[in-house]
Amino acid sequence: MPEFQLQRRLAADIAGVGLNNIKFNPERLEEVEEALTREDIKKLIKERAVIVNPKRGISSGRLKERKHKRRSKGEGRKHGSRKGKSGARTGDKEIWINKIRKIRRYIRWLRDNNVIDKHTYRLLYKRAKGNYFKNLSDVKSYLRQMGHKV
C-alpha cells in the first residue's frame, strides 16, 4: 500500500491532528493519489475517502479519582488551598441557619430549665428571628442586662 506522505501531511494539517490519525479508504486510493492540493484533500475528507480519527486528549479521570480520595480524608481543604472569602465557601444562608439553630436551641433549653419564663422566651425567639442578636454570646449578654443569671 502506498504511503501518500503529502496527502497524509496535508490532511493532518487541515484536520489539526497528528499524522497517525489519518486513514485512507482502501477502495478510493486512486482518488487520494491524485489529490495534490489542500482543496482536493478537504473535498476527500468531506466525502470520507480520507478518514480523520479524532484527536485523543489526556484523560483526567484517574487524577479526579485520586483528588477525591485525598479530599475525603480532609487533605487539600486547609488554609493554603483556600481561595476566596469565607463567605464564598459557606453561603450566607448556611451561616444564618447554623446561627439561628444554635440560638433557638439555647433559649429552648433556658425555658425548659425554668431559667426564663415563656414570655421572655417568646420575646427572645422573635428577636432572634429578626436578626437582633449577632451570636450566642450576644444573647447571653442581653439576658445578663435584663437581670437573668446565665
Curated annotation (Swiss-Prot):
Sequence segments annotated as region (Disordered): 56-90
Name this protein carries in UniProt: Large ribosomal subunit protein eL19
An annotated GO BP: translation
GO CC annotations on file: cytosolic large ribosomal subunit
Entry function: Binds to the 23S rRNA.
UniProt xrefs under InterPro entries: 60S_ribosomal_eL19_sf (IPR035970), Ribosomal_eL19 (IPR039547), Ribosomal_eL19_arc (IPR033936), Ribosomal_eL19_CS (IPR023638), Ribosomal_eL19_dom (IPR000196), Ribosomal_eL19_dom1 (IPR015972)
Signal peptide: none
Recorded GO MF terms: large ribosomal subunit rRNA binding; structural constituent of ribosome
Keyword Lipoprotein: no
Subunit structure and binding partners: Part of the 50S ribosomal subunit.
Similarity-based family: Belongs to the eukaryotic ribosomal protein eL19 family.
Top-rank lineage group of the source organism: Archaea
PROSITE patterns: RIBOSOMAL_L19E
Keyword Lipid metabolism attached: no
Keywords for this protein: Ribonucleoprotein, Ribosomal protein, RNA-binding, rRNA-binding
Organism in which the protein naturally occurs: Sulfolobus acidocaldarius (strain ATCC 33909 / DSM 639 / JCM 8929 / NBRC 15157 / NCIMB 11770)
